């Protein structure tokens, strides 16, 4: 992750804009869960149509802001990654043309170049930048439904460990995707079951709106943890490939 931070802050003005955009995206991402919470707990009890319309318009505006800032951030990330890694890829191509290589050496360098190209897309950097705000979802969960926060934290750890150990566990990509869907569904069942029990059996302030809203937040947090773990592994592969290519370029 040090290399990621180093690359990010090569252009401090762009890094600042990316962090600000990520903060706004994180705030706007709270809209669906807060909308569900307020509609179920406030509108259904009051029945005032103008309140529902105002809430719906507000939520749509926030989602539109999130989409716009994600698009803008993706463009900035692509420009930054191209500025950093395109010279390395160009230097590799030039060096390969000027050097006699065995078939195995050529394949290894070609694979390293493909790793760099694949790991420089905007999604990977965006997933890393979103991680602090995924933790913000957990903090919000603590205030809404603390049991959902605990359950989500456990599933996030499981998801991140499985993603990090995917190669050691010999999991294929399809199996990993199926496992992610299974964990997402299992977490929803656990959160709703525990929440329903608390509403009916315990003397607590948890409401149906808070329960459903907290489940949406927990799902976003789990997705964010999964994406962060994948991005972290991609960054590690990119660093190894970059080191391999630079070593080859500098070889006399």
Positions of PLM-derived features:
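Cytosolic ends of transmembrane helices, especially the final helix of ABC transmembrane type-1 domains
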Residues: 221-248
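Hydrophobic/aromatic residues in alpha-helical transmembrane segments
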Residues: 32-39, 57, 73, 77, ...
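Membrane-integrated ABC transporters
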Residues: 1-31, 45, 49-54, 73, ...
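Residue-level hotspots within the lipid-embedded alpha helices of multi-pass solute transporters
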Residues: 22-30, 63-67, 83, 95, ...
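A hydrophobic transmembrane-helix motif
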Residues: 30-37, 125-166, 171-213
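Extended non-transmembrane interhelical loops and adjacent amphipathic helices
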Residues: 1, 78-118, 167-169, 239-250
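Transmembrane helix-loop-helix hairpins at lipid-water interfaces of multipass membrane proteins
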Residues: 15-72, 143, 147, 193, ...
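DHp/HisKA histidine-phosphotransfer helix
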Residues: 105, 120, 175-178, 207-213, ...
């Amino acid at each position: 992750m040090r290399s990621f931070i180093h690359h990010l802050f090569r252009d401090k003005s762009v890094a600042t804009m990316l962090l600000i955009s990520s903060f706004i995206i994180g705030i706007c991402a709270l809209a669906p869960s807060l909308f569900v919470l307020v509609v179920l707990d406030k509108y259904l009890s009051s029945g005032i149509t103008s309140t529902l319309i105002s809430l719906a318009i507000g939520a749509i505006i926030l989602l539109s802001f999130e989409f716009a800032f994600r698009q803008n951030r993706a463009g900035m990330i692509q420009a930054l990654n191209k500025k950093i890694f395109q010279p390395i890829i160009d230097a590799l191509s030039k060096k390969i043309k000027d050097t006699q290589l065995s078939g195995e050496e050529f394949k290894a360098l070609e694979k390293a170049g493909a790793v760099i190209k694949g790991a420089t897309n905007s999604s990977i950097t965006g997933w890393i930048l979103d991680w602090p705000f995924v933790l913000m979802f957990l903090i919000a969960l603590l205030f809404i439904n603390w049991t959902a926060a605990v359950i989500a934290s456990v599933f996030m750890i499981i998801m991140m460990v499985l993603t990090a150990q995917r190669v050691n566990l010999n999991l294929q990509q399809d199996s990993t995707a199926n496992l992610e869907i299974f964990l997402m569904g299992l977490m929803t069942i656990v959160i709703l079951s525990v929440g329903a029990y608390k509403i009916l059996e315990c003397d607590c302030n948890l409401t149906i709106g808070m329960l459903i809203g907290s489940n949406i937040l927990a799902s976003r947090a789990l997705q964010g943890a999964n994406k962060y773990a994948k991005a972290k592994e991609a960054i590690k592969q990119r660093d190894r490939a970059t080191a391999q290519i630079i070593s080859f370029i500098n070889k006399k």
